[in-house]
């Protein structure tokens, strides 16, 4: 989805931006620099102007899920602000943003409205809470396919049965690709009718062979050469000058609408250097669905990411797959003594969800046993904030899902890799427990002179990572040290 401020800054016939006039938040909030403060102000403005909200929109489901988590954690403060008619300076430090909301939207205390919001939010069950807060809302609209699919159940829970969650069209930064003719379909059934005149599209046949390695045919086919049921990597030649550009998406031809193919998103295509990797986004998502079922009432999976660290040829000759999981605050998994045994029981079923490529690599000994890491609550939100501060557009940020090796970026946003390159570092420094099939454990970290050490039960490796920081596994002291710069 292309990122542009044209729709917000441009003026319509009457001199006002058509996009800005459709929002309940003032321009100072929409164009603000701090994402967390923006979300808080959006929620506050939406609650104050509750009778003017007729739909809830977000570019991606991940952004809407973050806003809902903020509503869950800050609803009491939001009610206090509504009751007093002020914006808490500790939460919103941006003076322009705070002043615009306080003077232009709140316009004085609203004790009755604050009481109404309190009565709705103080319930234990938040099913259908969005419909109760905004009874005139007709629908929720956001991207819920691909890696966004994991957020759909939570959003649907908050929306309830009476408030539909609609899918959006298939838009990329390079060009428009397809339109969604059945917007009420659940993510797993969503298809897009290709727009044949939006660009010149070609399709590279894509196959996950017996080893799970992406195998692409040398010659692409055009729109007339695709076959229903086959999987392809999408290529576009655009009117703006991109020639045979690989969009990076793998799609399945679900059928045809008249003569236009109906596309079903499958996964992101692995980068060229990672063809042959053992983890795909869909594999990891399937594993996390299983993990959530195993948790039952022991907590909720908030976010997750998977990465593979290469062996060094020494003590650790094999690559190691790790899935970092953030669970809801108060989860039993945050209790080390109770969770270690549970995680060990989980690793074997999770390995069974990781696809043929991973299972083959495990059988041949190329990959070490799976490690499941529990990171501290809020880790992925801090990761998002770091990426946004580093230049990632807030409305386009996608949480990392999987990376092939320890020498590649975990984040799905190539233009701002400088910030994304620190994602593995931030995940590792937030780890409170890692358990694998071979009984290795990473316990609480301790900070000392700018380095973070995670004590482990056996020695692993010494290995340097991306530019800007490195990892050193001390084989004698049985400790792991993360350096912000390469150690001497």
Curated annotation (Swiss-Prot):
Q: What EC number(s) has UniProt assigned to this enzyme?
A: 6.3.2.-
* Expression tissues: Expressed in roots and callus.
Please give the superkingdom of this protein's source. Answer: Eukaryota
Which leading EC class covers this enzyme?
A: ligase
Q: Care to name a GO molecular-function term for this sequence? A: acid-amino acid ligase activity
Q: Which GO terms describe its cellular component?
A: cytoplasm
Task: Report the record's Gene Ontology biological process terms.
Answer: response to auxin; response to light stimulus
- What triggers or suppresses the expression of this protein? At low level by auxin.
What UniProt keywords are attached to this protein's entry? Answer: Ligase
Query: Could you tell me which PANTHER family the record lists for this protein?
Result: GH3 DOMAIN-CONTAINING PROTEIN, INDOLE-3-ACETIC ACID-AMIDO SYNTHETASE GH3.6-RELATED
The entry sums up its family as follows:
Belongs to the IAA-amido conjugating enzyme family.
The protein's job, in short, is: May catalyze the synthesis of indole-3-acetic acid (IAA)-amino acid conjugates, providing a mechanism for the plant to cope with the presence of excess auxin.
Q: What is this protein called?
A: Probable indole-3-acetic acid-amido synthetase GH3.6
Name the encoding gene, please: GH3.6
């Amino acid at each position: 989805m292309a990122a542009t401020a044209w729709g917000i800054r441009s003026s319509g016939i009457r001199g006002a931006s058509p996009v800005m006039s459709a929002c309940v938040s003032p321009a100072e909030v929409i164009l603000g620099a701090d994402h967390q403060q923006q979300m808080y102000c959006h929620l506050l403005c939406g609650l104050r102007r509750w009778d003017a909200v007729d739909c809830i929109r977000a570019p991606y489901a991940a952004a809407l899920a973050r806003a809902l988590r903020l509503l869950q954690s800050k609803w009491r403060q939001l009610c206090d602000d509504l009751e007093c008619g002020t914006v808490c300076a500790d939460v919103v430090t941006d003076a322009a943003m705070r002043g615009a909301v306080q003077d232009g939207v709140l316009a004085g205390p609203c004790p009755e409205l604050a009481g109404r919001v309190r009565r709705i939010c103080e319930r234990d069950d938040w099913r259908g809470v969005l419909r109760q807060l905004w009874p005139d809302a007709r629908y929720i609209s956001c991207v819920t396919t691909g890696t966004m699919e994991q957020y759909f159940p939570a959003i649907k829970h908050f929306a309830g049965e009476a408030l539909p969650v609609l899918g959006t069209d298939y838009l990329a930064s390079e060009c428009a690709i397809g339109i969604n003719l059945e917007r009420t379909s659940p993510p797993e059934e969503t298809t897009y009718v290709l727009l044949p005149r939006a660009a010149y599209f070609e399709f590279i046949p894509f196959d996950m062979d017996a080893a799970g390695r992406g195998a692409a045919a040398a010659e692409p086919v055009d729109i007339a050469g695709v076959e229903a049921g086959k999987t392809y990597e999408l290529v576009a030649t655009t009117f703006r000058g991109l020639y045979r550009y690989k969009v990076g998406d793998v799609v399945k031809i679900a059928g045809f609408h008249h003569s236009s193919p109906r596309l079903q998103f499958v996964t992101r295509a692995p980068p060229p250097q990672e063809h042959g990797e053992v983890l795909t986004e869909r594999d990891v998502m399937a594993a996390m669905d299983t993990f959530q079922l195993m948790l039952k009432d022991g907590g909720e999976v908030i976010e997750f990411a998977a990465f593979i660290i290469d062996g060094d040829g020494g003590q650790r000759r094999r690559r190691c797959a790790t899935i970092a999981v953030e669970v809801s605050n108060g989860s039993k998994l945050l209790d080390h003594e109770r969770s270690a045994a549970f995680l060990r029981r989980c690793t074997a079923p999770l390995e069974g969800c990781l696809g043929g490529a991973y299972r083959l690599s495990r059988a041949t000994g190329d990959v070490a046993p799976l490690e499941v890491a529990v990171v501290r609550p809020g880790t992925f939100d801090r990761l998002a904030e770091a990426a946004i501060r580093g230049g990632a557009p807030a409305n386009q940020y996608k949480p990392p899902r999987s990376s092939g090796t320890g020498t590649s970026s975990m984040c799905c946003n190539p233009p701002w890799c400088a910030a994304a390159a620190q994602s593995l570092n931030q995940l590792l420094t937030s780890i409170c427990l890692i358990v694998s099939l071979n009984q290795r454990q990473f316990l609480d970290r301790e900070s000392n002179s700018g380095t973070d050490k995670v004590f482990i039960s056996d020695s692993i490796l010494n290995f340097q990572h991306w530019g800007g920081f490195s990892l050193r596994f001390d084989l004698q002291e049985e400790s792991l040290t993360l350096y912000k710069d390469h150690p001497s």
